[in-house]
Amino acid sequence: MSELLLELFSEEIPAFIQKDAEEGYLSIFTKIFEENEIFAKIQVFSGPRRITLYATHLPKVTLPKEIEIKGPSTEAPEAAINGFCKAHNVSKLELSTKLINNQLYYFYIKKVEERQIKEILPEIIVEAINKYSWAKSMFWGNYNIKWIRPLRNILCIFDSEILPLQFGHLAANNVTFGHRLTDNKKLEVTDFEDYKTKLTENYVILERLKREEIIKTSLLEQANSHNLTIKEDLRLIEEVAGLSEFPVVLCGAIPQKFLELPKEVLISSMRTHQKYFCLFDRSENFAPYFLFVSNGQFANSKLVVQGNEKVLSARLSDALYFYKQDISKTLEANLEKLAAVTFHTKLGSLKEKVERITNICKYIDPDNKDLITAAKLCKSDLVSEMVGEFPELQGIMGYYYAKHENLNEEIAVAIRDHYKPQGLSDSVPVGNAALLAIADKLDSLVGLMIAGEAPTGSGDPYALRRQVLGIIRIIIENKLELNLNSLIDFSLKLYSSDKDKDLIISFFEERAKFYFKNEYDISLINAVLDLNLANIKFKLDALKEFLEKEDGKQLLNAYKRASNILGSQNIDGAVEPSLFNTQPEKELFEVTQKLSLQIVDKDYDKALNLLQTLLTPITSFFDNVLVNDSDPKIAKNRLLILQDVCKLFHKIAKFNRL
């Protein structure tokens, strides 16, 4: 069996798309090989400057085969038959026929001779290279090819021989290059093992997962050597593994003066902006050290550490300056600055948004002074120097500035947490933060819907789906007894609008279904879904349990029977007991009347238990009473009884949706 080695050597490939390219090229090459009946074991490796494919167990030749090509019907016009023959360069006598669905068709049996694999590989390799679609690609020079970054070399060998492959201006060879530290020394290779060995000798670790494992192990070793801890950050490890061909973990020091900064500022400066790893002592306090991944084994690692310490100190010096500037002013002093910041061109400034949020909070809990104060100040940090430099710290800096002003913890936490949850995995805020989060998200939703920014199938630029799901989660997980319907009305009034309410309610219902869909059947969700979200999970569990019992199943069948008899008609009038002439209809009416007074939606468990007492009389009614009596008055009276029965079910859930 044979082997193929292909390396696409380029300028720096962004770290965040290397893994996708690895998986994408594996999929494309596998598919194209299979289409050409070449079956092989394929591996793809990615790194900062190369994408490598290694295929083994390749045959040396393709197997001869016959391809059956369907032509026109034997009854088709002669011109169509001649056209088919001409297209395949055969005569009519060379065609065979086959009966398909009582119709005779011409077929051409094309014989494909065996071919040397090395003859067809260049063509399908170029096809595969072109087929992968990068998120963004580029042209360079005057060349007519495009790739994620300028390609500098293509290595392609099949059984130690260079394949005559041409991709744009690049002809394949048997040369690769080591780490930049080796001055891009040319390395001639004969096969995969030779390739891998020479790369390792020249400070290139081919396998992405191996680089990640080296980084992970080295981080723990460095942390332990300083008697410190490090929090696992797989995403950052994956990213720095894509930035380094030969990762070496080094440790730098943080000057003590910077430790007065909030820990989130330190983490953001190091992790997000510098790709550094933070260290903590055994009590989880921030340690005055950081770890970073160097791309290569430098002779003077101290110089590398000093360089990184200098870069971090410069960034933290700026952060400390911004922080001191910010705490010299109050959050309230920033309110006027919000007037100059646009929330949305059709919806005014952030100052106007804050006023609306505050009004919604007053509507929710008019006597809650902490909530109202938090609402007034919740966006003030957006015009701070620190958030201008580190936008990801919005809310967090507001918390620290509120604490610096000696505002109480409840206000500070509400300012910090009102952006939560920021995804399905994020926790929901509690207390005043929960109410403020609802007010903020609801104002955004209502305003942006009015502004015509409703999500579409192709996009949701304002993340309204996430914001509505956030409101739903906050209400459900905090068991908040909020009248969402009236809240939507109030929010619409703040925009002096009464349009789009139905669209907004429909949007809430759609996201609620999404929230529950993995746990409950959609018909069950539809049966209990309304804007009173606080008890919806309890209702779902209770109704699910009820319908799994034998009594519940029988009652549902009885409801459906009653509903089917009634159809879509809405019968006017009230039941007249004087028209009863059977005991079952009298008993069903009496139980229905009694239950209509006892069943209350809020006491759901009790309501379902009471509903079970309907089973015996309704079963007896259907077994012994003819609804469509010959006397029209009696027939109508019995239909009215069934209508009352259905209304009783509807007090508990929309049973017509089950």
Curated annotation (Swiss-Prot):
Its main location: cytoplasm. The keyword Cytoplasm applies. It is found in: Cytoplasm. It is an enzyme of class 6 (ligase). Pfam families: DALR_1, tRNA_synt_2f. One of its GO terms (molecular function) is arginine-tRNA ligase activity. GO terms for cellular component: cytosol. Transmembrane segments: none annotated. Keywords: Aminoacyl-tRNA synthetase, ATP-binding, Cytoplasm, Ligase, Nucleotide-binding, Protein biosynthesis. It catalyses: tRNA(Gly) + glycine + ATP = glycyl-tRNA(Gly) + AMP + diphosphate. It comes from the Bacteria. InterPro entries: DALR_anticod-bd, Gly-tRNA-synth_bsu, Gly-tRNA-synth_heterodimer. Its EC number is 6.1.1.14. GO terms for biological process: arginyl-tRNA aminoacylation; glycyl-tRNA aminoacylation. The keyword Nucleotide-binding applies. Tetramer of two alpha and two beta subunits. Belongs to the class-II aminoacyl-tRNA synthetase family. This is Glycine--tRNA ligase beta subunit. It comes from Rickettsia bellii (strain OSU 85-389).
